[in-house]
Amino acid sequence: MLMRTATPLDQPRAIGSARVSSKRVNGGSGIDGLRQSGALKLLFPTSRDIVQATLINTAGGVTGGDRFDIDGCAGAGSRLTITTQAAERAYGAQIGQTGEIKTNLKAEAGSRLFWLPQETILYKDAAIDRQLGVDLSTGAEFLMVEPVLFGRRAMGEDVSTLAFRDRIDIRRDGAPIYLDAIHLQGDVATHLDRPAIADGARAMASLVWVSAEAEGRIDALRRIIGRSGGVSMLHPDVLVMRLLAADGYILRRSLIPVLDLITDDTLPQSWRL
């Protein structure tokens, strides 16, 4: 029998999907629908008022050829928070292979949906394509944060070469209220060192808060972040923030007080570990 040499395409790839929805139940919130398969799992800490779903990637990270799909829906009048058990790690990929993460979220009228994943750590030669689509109904409250680390500075990790494409599309009743795209490729470290881009920072976070309360808290949020970022109102109820930091530890030092203020100290416990 002839033996064939393995190629990069022969390597096993991680595929996973997770879907969760919430509904109003007896004055609180409960799980309405749940599906999970492959390398994505969901855990639910006990809570009557909020459905808190914790995503777990059993593959241990994302690399070229992996595919993950996440769907979340907060039904009318319910509260749903989706977070991750730990930081997601994007490892080096084979040439021509890209890992894909697609997330679709929906918040119906009178609901509250928080999308609070922990950091995504990009390692040398990572190749990641992420898409986040959000569909809001009038009267829905929404919060998202997306922290990203370019290597870990304390470990001396190099991010001189990687490919990172990230797109966020938030719409309300079908009309766009926030569109953002990041595309970094090649010698990312040199790009990040430029004063007009990141001025040497190796950690960043994007935050969007859609709430009638947002404008009233903008001054308090500015005091928390100081000169580490910027915060402004895109619309009377749409607040956006961008943070930069030298590393992940410093980023968290600013980000957790921000999230505590916005969530009224209901930040998932996994963020405290």
From Swiss-Prot:
GO molecular function: nickel cation binding
Protein localization: Cytoplasm
InterPro entries: UreD
Pfam families documented for this protein: UreD (PF01774)
Region (Disordered) location: 1-29
Any single GO CC term annotated in Swiss-Prot or TrEMBL for this entry: cytoplasm
Highest taxon of source: Bacteria
Primary residence: cytoplasm
Keyword Electron transport: no
Keyword Chaperone: yes
UniProtKB keywords: Chaperone, Cytoplasm, Nickel insertion
Assembly, per entry: UreD, UreF and UreG form a complex that acts as a GTP-hydrolysis-dependent molecular chaperone, activating the urease apoprotein by helping to assemble the nickel containing metallocenter of UreC. The UreE protein probably delivers the nickel.
HAMAP family per UniProt: UreD (MF_01384)
Task of the protein: Required for maturation of urease via the functional incorporation of the urease nickel metallocenter.
PANTHER family documented for this protein: UREASE ACCESSORY PROTEIN D
Family stated for the protein in its record: Belongs to the UreD family.
Protein name: Urease accessory protein UreD
Organism of provenance: Roseobacter denitrificans (strain ATCC 33942 / OCh 114) (Erythrobacter sp. (strain OCh 114))
Gene name of the encoded protein: ureD
